[in-house]
């Protein structure tokens, strides 16, 4: 007799990724693209992490709601995520805001972005819905969260981070009992409630929710009928369930995918220029906190066909070299020196230039003798010869987008305005 195989809950789930946000704190980086479409890690886009987590967890039905400046994001997903097959009971739906409910109504909130596509979700018949934010960097096996959701009998299970209590003021925070059932949900509290038994820490919402599909649809329809609702999961749906039903917290540490379990669970909201720069530069460490080399949990993406990176010239003061750096394919380091930098595809760094602490997006050209320190350079920028950034804070702030910590964002528009 053949033993019955265990059927993972993920096979009965649909992941729904909310990817319509701008990410305004990234300033000019999101002038032409939505935050989930922003480049990250030398090869991928931010959204690839949520999508890869779903795929690696065993989820084979995915929907992605888009809205703000979605062309770059949609094109990326069409190229890199087109391998789902209906004949294998797989689906990948890109769901731009398209006034499906009303001729005057776009997506009015995160909950509305799901509500307007109920007629697309229902025919697939998923037992569970995994609602995800498309703009965070982390690796997570959603199967563990699904299992806790079923075992606990919860109506919603919310992914949570354990963070120092006073750092939780910018999050939605869960007040839980000893069994992690949520007693109260507070949005950005001045005095966050601590965790039972660990009062110096609080449980902050990751914007990840698991529902039984039938229950979720009931909640969305009720919310849509409420004229006072803001149509948002964090502001409306979750507080209602916490007050009137059963909501449970799932601790991220229980499902975080990591190659070394002695290390802290890695999750980053790269929503500011400083955070974005730091998360990319972190990858240049000898052993980075985020393991992007783990073949058991790959980060899937659209990979261009490109030649390998090349380093040329070995003369005095003109040596193509890189130390503690990540360099993508099709880069040519022609007599330039790199340290603690991350370069995306197709970067050209010309002779005598020096990059230190640089995050360089695709197709950038760095002119001779340029000296660039602690910068983020947007896609396609041509850095003129001899440009110096990172030595004169006042001049940098006048020319570029400079943060309080000294990171400079450089775009082509800023370069075009230079009087050099």
From Swiss-Prot:
It is an enzyme of class 2 (transferase). Belongs to the bacterial/plant glucose-1-phosphate adenylyltransferase family. InterPro entries: ADP-Glc_PPase (IPR011831), ADP_Glu_pyroP_CS (IPR005836), GlgC_bac (IPR023049), GlmU/GlgC-like_hexapep (IPR056818), NTP_transferase_dom (IPR005835), Nucleotide-diphossugar_trans (IPR029044), Trimer_LpxA-like_sf (IPR011004). The gene is glgC. The lineage of its organism: Bacteria, Pseudomonadati, Pseudomonadota, Alphaproteobacteria, Hyphomicrobiales. It comes from Rhizobium rhizogenes (strain K84 / ATCC BAA-868) (Agrobacterium radiobacter). This is Glucose-1-phosphate adenylyltransferase. Homotetramer. Keywords: ATP-binding, Carbohydrate metabolism, Glycogen biosynthesis, Glycogen metabolism, Nucleotide-binding, Nucleotidyltransferase, Transferase. One of its GO terms (biological process) is glycogen biosynthetic process.
């Amino acid at each position: 007799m053949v033993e019955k195989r265990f059927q993972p809950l993920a096979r009965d789930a649909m992941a729904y990724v909310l990817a319509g946000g701008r990410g305004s704190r990234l300033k000019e980086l999101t002038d032409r693209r939505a935050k989930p479409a922003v480049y990250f890690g030398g090869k991928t886009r931010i959204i690839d992490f949520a999508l890869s987590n779903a795929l690696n967890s065993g989820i084979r039905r995915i929907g992605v709601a888009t809205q703000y400046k979605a062309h770059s994001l949609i094109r990326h997903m069409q190229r890199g995520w087109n391998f789902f097959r209906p004949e294998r009971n797989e689906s990948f739906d890109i769901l731009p805001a398209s006034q499906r409910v009303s001729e005057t109504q776009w997506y009015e909130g995160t909950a509305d972005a799901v509500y307007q596509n109920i007629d697309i979700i229902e025919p697939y018949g998923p037992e569970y819905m995994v609602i995800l934010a498309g703009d965070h960097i982390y690796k997570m096996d959603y199967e563990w969260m699904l299992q806790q959701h079923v075992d606990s009998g919860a109506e919603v299970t919310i992914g949570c981070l354990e963070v120092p209590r006073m750092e939780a003021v910018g999050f939605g925070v869960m007040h839980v009992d000893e069994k992690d059932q949520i007693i109260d949900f507070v949005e950005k509290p001045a005095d966050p409630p601590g965790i039972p038994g660990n009062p110096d820490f609080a449980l902050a919402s990751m914007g990840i929710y698991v529902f039984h599909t039938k229950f979720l649809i009931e909640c969305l329809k009720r919310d849509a009928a409420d004229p006072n609702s803001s149509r948002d999961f964090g502001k409306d749906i979750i507080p209602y369930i916490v007050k009137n039903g059963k909501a449970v917290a799932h601790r991220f540490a229980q499902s975080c995918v990591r190659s070394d379990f002695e290390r802290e669970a890695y999750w980053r909201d790269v929503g500011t220029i400083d955070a974005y720069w730091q998360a990319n530069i972190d990858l240049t460490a000898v052993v980075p906190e985020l393991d992007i080399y783990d073949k058991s949990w790959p980060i899937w993406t659209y990979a261009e066909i490109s030649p390998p990176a090349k380093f040329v010239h070995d003369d005095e003061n003109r040596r193509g070299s890189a130390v503690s750096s990540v360099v993508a394919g099709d880069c040519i380091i022609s007599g330039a020196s790199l340290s603690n930098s991350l370069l995306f595809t197709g970067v050209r760094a010309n002779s005598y230039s020096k990059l230190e602490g640089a995050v360089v997006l695709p197709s950038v050209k760095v002119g001779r003798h340029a000296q660039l320190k602690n910068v983020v350079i947007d896609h396609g920028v041509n850095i003129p010869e001899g440009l110096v950034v990172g030595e004169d804070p006042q001049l940098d702030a006048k020319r570029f987008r400079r943060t309080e910590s000294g990171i400079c964002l450089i775009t082509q528009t800023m370069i075009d305005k230079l009087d050099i």
